[in-house]
Structures are given as structure tokens and as C-alpha cells.
Amino acid sequence: MIIGYKEKEGEIRSSFETRATTKSVEFRVNVKPWATNTEGELISRLYNKERMLNHAAALQLISTKTAIPVPKLIGSGENPDGTAWLETERTHGGIWLDLVGETCRMPPSKQHTEGECEECAQTAQANASRYIQNEILPQLNALRSDTTGLNGVVIPPLWIMDYDPETFWTPKTDLEQKYVFCHGNLHAHSILMHAETLHVMKVVDWDNAGFFPAEFQHWTVTRLGYEEMFTNTERCKEFARLMV
């Protein structure tokens, strides 16, 4: 039971847990019947096992059709209780982009500071930004489809789900194949950087990936930029309109 939250009849809500099964494998399973928004409030959210299985389908597509570095998919599936699981190869030696600046990443003889390091943070952000623009986006934009979503399931970008958590989106077709493949949540905490070189190692968290209008190819390398994705309600409203 969750204090202060009354479950609505028939709603499907989700949360995810990550744990290591071995030193080289990461295992994720959706285990809790609720989700939270960016304010930390309990909310209703469509899609439970679908996001996990969509993540697996996206990893398989990206790993076979592009050179974008993603975790190696080991397996995925459904549990008897209706939840889903995802197993990937664990990546070692990395740091999330938004955590790089917590300390100086340079060798001891070349460190900028003993505490938080804005210079390292800016270097990592610049490296990630160039990599996204020069490597990731061209490859994603080259993947085309005449139908939105992925494998018949439409899970829109996270900021649209946060703006409109009640709508169940259905595939939309355009014979001109104008839909491009989008990550759906590409920001500083879905980019794993090498802790020493500060270059991109892996791009993770493909739960909301799929084929969408080109306008959905939205990304940021800063925390403020990520917050703006959710707070720009006019843009969220326009993007939601494009989904219909």
C-alpha cells in the first residue's frame, strides 16, 4: 500500500529496479506498481512491461543497424505475473555525463581542482554534444519507417508522457516514410562517458525509443536543458498533437 495515493480502477503503472546478477551483467525488472513524475509525485502511467520490451527491441535494432554504442542485449521477456525483464552486458569504467563534474577527472598531476570540477563537466558536455550531432543523430535519422512507434507499440518521449500521462497512443502511418528513429529520452543521464578520457562510451535507456516525426529528435547534455523539455508545455502540446 502507498500512503496518500489511491489507485484508480484498471490503471497500469510502472517502476523499474536495476540490480547486478553477475559482475558483467545488468538485470532490470519492473517490480513496483507505481511511477513518479519529475516533482517526485506518485502518478498514473500507461505502459508497464511494454517499456521494458520496447527497450529490448530498440537495443536490438540499434546494435544491428547502426554503429551507436549501446549495451549488449543478452535477453528479455515477460514474467508469469505480467511484469517484464531485461538483461544486458554491464559496462565498466564509465560515469554518467551529469555526474562528471562531481570531481576532477584528470590525472593527479594535471587536476584542475580538488573538489567539484566545472572544467571537466564542460569538456564532457562538449564531447557528448559533438558526438550526438556528428555520430548519433545522422545514424538515427537514417532509420526510416512509415509507422510511428516500434513493433506496433507507441511509447512517446518521456516528456510527452509526463505532459499527457493518460493517453494511450496508437500507431500512425504515413506512406512517405517520414518518421525517423528517436531515442526518446536522450539527455545527460542516458549518456555514459569514459571516466578518464571523457568521451562517450554508451548510450542507454532506450525505453521510449521509436519512430516519430523529425521534430521529436530532441536532446540535451545539461540538467537545465532536460528540465526545460518537461516545463516547455507549449512544445509538449504541439508534439502530442503530432502524435494523433
Give, region by region, the residue ranges found by the protein language model:
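Regulatory N- and C-terminal appendages and interdomain linkers associated
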Residues: 1-9, 83, 243-244
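Catalytic-loop signature of eukaryotic-like protein kinases
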Residues: 185, 189-192
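Flexible internal linker/loop segments at domain or repeat junctions
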Residues: 154-171, 175
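Active-site Asp-x-Gly
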Residues: 176, 180-181, 194-244
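Acidic active-site catalytic centers that drive phospho-/nucleotidyl reactions
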Residues: 55, 185, 204-205
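Well-ordered beta-strand positions
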Residues: 19, 192-194
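Residues that form or immediately flank small-molecule/cofactor binding pockets and catalytic motifs
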Residues: 31, 78, 155, 208-211
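ATP-binding pocket architecture of kinase catalytic cores
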Residues: 8-149
